[in-house]
């Protein structure tokens, strides 16, 4: 059998090879026209380097399937390398929204409320309708009686140094009277300690009527202005040589009997310095009576201060004649030192920041920059510890129903950045007055550089107002509230705003006037209901005179006389 010749020969027919499979259309363009008639296929163009590497990698992976076990590790390594090349500076920072009440937004609230506030044509005037709370059981009356008869022989002399401002010194005076009476000692007129903050060198007689003070207490406590010569000779006429007791704050009266009286009997003179808040509020009734007698009856401002104060009261009543001779007094604490001490942030920008840093260093020298001390202005504001600004006081009073024509007496020191911060308050209450506006320069000249004497004038005008508004804690409003209760049948006639609630309301620029006014009227009503309160064991008798210093008008009460002599 002849083998078939695979090579073509001329004139011979041979079986043709099987037909080649049709080439995919995607590869048809690879055959050139020159080779179209050729029987031999043309050589394919070489693959690219990327194709070769891909085929090599794929073939390795298919032959070595165990490599897939390392795929997660390879993936993580690649991701770490990638992340190392990315800059995270461009990642957006999500800032948390400040908690409600932590930011000062009162100017925005004022701008939002002012059109509606000015358009409010309510006819009711708060000053004539504010006090509606009825006295449960009837009104109260003062019942501090003076003792009769001669005093027993004195156990010695007590000399105290009263530090602080006007009303902190007042606390020391009244407590010294109580301690001297309890120990059957003779009280030396208290010495006022000069303080760099208050910068007032005034003596007792410059502020109070010394003669009236001594005579009012004459049947209960001996009071002298000097120590006998024979005693001072023992100490070389130097009070620093006298034995000094450093008494703990809020010490009970028994401490004075057990620890101080023996030394007093031995030395016949002792010194207590400092003496601010050195006697607890919880004391026997006989001791409380002496406190009441000293504070509400014996302490009267000097004739010059009292005369000017009463003159300003008369002028305020004359100006407010169309309001029934009634005016509102506001104790505003927005002086530079108060703003600095609070550590709150307002709207004064960088200038305010620099001013406050300088004021803190000037007044407290490093107290606020100690290592580890953290100051959180937002939390301070939320807790109601920031002093109210003049703008906030104006918004609050307008919301409480005091209209634009209300007469306001502003008791304050030098307001921080007054030209800017006082402008909104004057817009809301154009009939606002201060002692500097009511009195002439000649009338104020003797008191100008004495902060305690100026505070005494403010105290007098506030005492006789129909409404007293306190905007910040402190001795001034606490004493004034107690004194007003003593004068007005047990009711303080005082507005004490809820500053925590105010912080939240003033942090809402979207609040409407009706909603804001409703909240303020509720706050006013709450102050009315709290106007009359009985003293609790740890309350100050200088703020809550009932029932230790007062009795019901429909009851006859004979208070306890002087305490028995301590021996």
Swiss-Prot record:
One annotated Gene Ontology cellular component of this protein: Golgi membrane
Residues holding substrate: 331-333
CDD domains xrefs: O-FucT_plant
EC nos: 2.4.1.-
Top class in the EC scheme: transferase
Subcellular location: Golgi apparatus membrane
GO molecular function: glycosyltransferase activity
Pathway the protein acts in: Protein modification; protein glycosylation
Glycosylation sites per record: 121, 145, 184, 238, 403, 419, 449, 538, 554
Ranges facing Cytoplasmic side: 1-65
Disordered: annotated span: 1-41
Record topology, Lumenal segments: 87-567
Residue ranges crossing the lipid bilayer per the database entry: 66-86
Membrane topology: Single-pass type II membrane protein
Biased composition (Basic residues): 23-32
Swiss-Prot/TrEMBL keywords: Carbohydrate metabolism, Cell adhesion, Cell wall biogenesis/degradation, Fucose metabolism, Glycoprotein, Glycosyltransferase, Golgi apparatus, Membrane, Signal-anchor, Transferase, Transmembrane, Transmembrane helix
Biological process (GO), any one: cell adhesion
Pfam families to which the protein is assigned, alphabetical: O-FucT
The UniProt record lists the keyword Magnesium: no
This protein's record includes keyword Lyase: no
Tissue specificity annotation: Ubiquitous.
Family to which this protein belongs: Belongs to the glycosyltransferase GT106 family.
Role this protein plays: Glycosyltransferase that plays a role in cell adhesion.
Protein's name in the database: Protein ESMERALDA 1
Source organism (scientific name): Arabidopsis thaliana (Mouse-ear cress)
Gene: ESMD1
């Amino acid at each position: 059998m002849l083998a078939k010749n695979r090579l073509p020969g001329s004139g011979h027919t041979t079986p043709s090879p099987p037909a080649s499979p049709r080439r995919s259309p995607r590869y048809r363009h690879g055959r050139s026209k020159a080779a179209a008639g050729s029987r031999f296929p043309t050589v394919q163009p070489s693959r690219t380097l990327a194709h070769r590497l891909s085929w090599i990698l794929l073939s390795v992976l298919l032959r070595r399937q165990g490599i897939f076990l390392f795929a997660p590790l390879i993936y993580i390594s690649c991701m770490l390398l990638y992340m190392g090349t990315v800059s995270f500076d461009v990642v957006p920072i999500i800032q948390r929204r400040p908690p409600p009440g932590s930011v000062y937004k009162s100017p925005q609230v004022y701008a939002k409320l002012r059109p509606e506030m000015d358009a409010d044509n309510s006819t009711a005037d708060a000053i004539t309708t504010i006090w509606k709370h009825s006295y449960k059981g009837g009104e109260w009356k003062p019942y501090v009686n003076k003792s009769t008869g001669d005093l027993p022989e004195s156990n010695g002399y007590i000399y105290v140094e009263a530090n602080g401002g006007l009303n902190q010194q007042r606390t020391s005076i009244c407590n010294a009277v109580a301690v001297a009476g309890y120990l059957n000692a003779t009280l030396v007129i208290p010495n006022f300690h000069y303080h760099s903050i208050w910068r007032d060198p005034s003596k007792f007689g410059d502020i109070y009527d010394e003669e009236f003070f001594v005579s009012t207490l004459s049947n209960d406590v001996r009071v002298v202005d000097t120590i006998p010569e024979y005693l001072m000779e023992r100490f070389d006429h130097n009070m620093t040589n006298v034995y000094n007791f450093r008494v703990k704050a809020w010490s009970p009266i028994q401490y004075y009997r057990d620890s101080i009286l023996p030394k007093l009997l031995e030395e016949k003179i002792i010194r207590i310095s400092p003496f601010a808040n050195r006697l607890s509020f919880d004391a026997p009734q006989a001791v409380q009576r002496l406190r009441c007698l000293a504070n509400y009856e014996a302490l009267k401002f000097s004739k010059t201060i009292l005369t000017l104060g009463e003159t300003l009261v008369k002028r305020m009543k004359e100006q407010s004649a169309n309001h029934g001779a009634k005016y509102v007094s506001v104790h505003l604490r927005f002086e530079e030192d108060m703003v600095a001490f609070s550590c709150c942030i307002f709207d004064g920008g960088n200038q305010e920041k620099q001013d406050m840093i300088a004021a803190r260093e000037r007044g407290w020298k490093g107290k606020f920059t100690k290592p580890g001390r953290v100051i959180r202005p937002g939390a301070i504001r939320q807790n109601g510890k920031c002093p109210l600004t003049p703008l906030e006081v104006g918004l609050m009073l307008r919301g409480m129903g005091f209209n634009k024509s209300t007469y306001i007496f502003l008791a304050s020191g030098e307001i921080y950045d007054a030209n800017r911060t006082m402008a909104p308050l004057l817009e809301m209450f154009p009939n606002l007055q201060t002692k500097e506006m009511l009195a002439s320069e000649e009338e104020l000249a003797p008191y100008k550089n004495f902060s305690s004497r100026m505070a005494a004038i403010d105290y007098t005008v506030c005492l006789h107002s129909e409404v007293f508004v306190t905007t910040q804690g402190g001795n001034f409003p606490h004493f004034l509230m107690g004194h007003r209760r003593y004068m007005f049948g047990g009711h303080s006639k005082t507005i004490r705003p809820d500053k925590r609630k105010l912080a939240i309301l003033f942090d809402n620029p979207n609040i409407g006037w009706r909603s804001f006014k409703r909240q303020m009227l509720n706050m006013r009503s709450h102050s009315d209901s709290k106007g009359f309160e009985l003293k609790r064991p740890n309350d100050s008798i200088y703020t809550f005179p009932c029932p230790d210093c007062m009795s019901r008008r429909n009851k006859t009460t004979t208070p306890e006389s002087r305490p028995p002599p301590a021996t």
